């Protein structure tokens, strides 16, 4: 009799499984990995790293699909988002984004002006970092089959800084945050029909490679790096803790949150740590280099608020890094949040679905 691989507790896939938090991890761990895990080159990372022929360099590749609602938002649109999101996933592996593919799934009836505006936005972002389009595809589906427009991308880039991995955290590492958190998620909340919030808040949607390029060319020990998209900062830190069997301690006062983001969070009862970002990354770095790395990030407009927000206080010496392990079952794998009065609480792995169709 064939062994049953899955312990997935649902008979149908819940919306929360697309959140980038615990439910997403559960779906991947219980449905995908039992069947596909042995084929993955780079399990648990936003991009896989591979060698190509006789090239002296490795390459990073990432695929992503963008389904945001609304498709136009303060600070960008689905076109800009698709390039920035895919480019950033490759950059998080220490690579320079160089090539991209694009797949468009268009709902019948989408306005010509709307589509052209999105394509112009894509062209602007592609030109910004000199990306080359390798291939593209277009499908038009009957009205009601999808919501306006979905975009799939695959980005490829040459690795300039090797060894970056969520499994590579070391005891004593300093955790750096490149920018204020929550702007993308809060701005999408504010723009959704029915919520009725009026705000000047803009999404932080941006390509991060230009800010990170000096770090890739220098002699810096970057152990882990991740852009804080779905699930926000909380998801990134908990994924790192899980993968490296580490305890991470974060100083709440060091995390910069814009007042408008705080306002949206207070009105809706949200934690800014769990809101999506599209122009923010976290780094785990050699402690002696942390201050210099922060200064380099601050020299770029996207990193002007970069700061050290915490450190890795413990790493299990016997950990076997695998995203197939359950964070909740490992007491050493945790993220601790300290407030200004010295009290501590866990920064929980995001549960449920805060906001569907966020990116």
Where are the predicted features?
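Acidic, Ser/Thr/Pro-rich beta/coil linker or hinge segments at domain junctions
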Residues: 300-359
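Active-site-proximal betaalpha loop/short-helix elements
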Residues: 20, 107-109, 201-277
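Short Gly/Ser/Thr- and Asp/Glu-enriched loop/turn motifs at secondary-structure junctions
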Residues: 43-45, 275-280
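Short, ordered loop/turn segments at secondary-structure junctions
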Residues: 18, 65, 105, 137-139, ...
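Short amphipathic alpha-helices in soluble, non-transmembrane regions
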Residues: 292-302
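Glycine-rich phosphate/pyrophosphate-binding loop regions near the starts of catalytic domains
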Residues: 14, 22-177, 183, 188, ...
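N-terminal amphipathic/basic leader segments beginning at the initiator methionine
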Residues: 1-31, 330-332, 347-355
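Helix N-cap motif at beta-to-alpha junctions
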Residues: 285-290
């Amino acid at each position: 009799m064939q062994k049953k691989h899955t312990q997935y507790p649902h008979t149908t896939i819940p919306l929360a499984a697309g959140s980038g938090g615990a439910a997403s991890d559960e779906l991947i761990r219980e449905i995908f990995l039992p069947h596909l895990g042995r084929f993955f080159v780079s399990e648990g990372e936003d991009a896989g790293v591979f060698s190509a022929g006789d090239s002296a360099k490795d390459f990073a590749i990432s695929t992503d699909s963008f389904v945001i609602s609304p498709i136009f938002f303060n600070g960008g649109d689905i076109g800009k988002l698709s390039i920035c999101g895919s480019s950033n996933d490759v950059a998080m592996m220490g690579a320079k984004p160089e090539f991209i593919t694009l797949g468009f799934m268009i709902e019948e009836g989408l306005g010509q002006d709307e589509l052209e505006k999105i394509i112009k936005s894509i062209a602007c972002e592609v030109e910004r970092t000199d990306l080359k389009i390798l291939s593209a595809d277009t499908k038009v589906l009957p009205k009601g089959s999808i919501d306006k427009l979905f975009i799939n991308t695959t980005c490829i880039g040459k690795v300039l800084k090797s060894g970056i991995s969520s499994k590579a955290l070391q005891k004593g590492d300093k955790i750096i945050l490149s920018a204020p958190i929550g702007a993308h998620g809060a701005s999408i909340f504010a723009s959704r029909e029915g919520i009725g919030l009026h705000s000047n808040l803009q999404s932080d949607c941006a390509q991060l490679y230009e800010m990170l390029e000096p770090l890739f060319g220098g002699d810096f020990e970057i152990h882990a790096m991740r852009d804080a998209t779905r699930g926000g900062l909380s998801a990134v830190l908990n994924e790192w803790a899980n993968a490296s069997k580490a305890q991470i301690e974060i100083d709440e006062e060091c995390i910069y949150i814009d007042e408008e983001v705080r306002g949206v969070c207070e009105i809706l009862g949200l934690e800014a740590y769990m809101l999506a970002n599209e122009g923010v990354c976290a780094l785990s770095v050699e402690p002696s280099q942390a201050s210099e790395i922060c200064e380099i990030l601050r020299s770029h407009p996207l990193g002007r608020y970069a700061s050290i927000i915490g450190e890795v206080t413990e790493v299990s010496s016997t950990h076997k890094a695998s995203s197939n392990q359950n964070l909740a079952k490992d007491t050493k794998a945790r993220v601790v949040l300290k407030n200004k009065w010295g009290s501590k609480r866990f920064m929980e792995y995001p549960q449920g679905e805060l906001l569907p169709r966020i990116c």
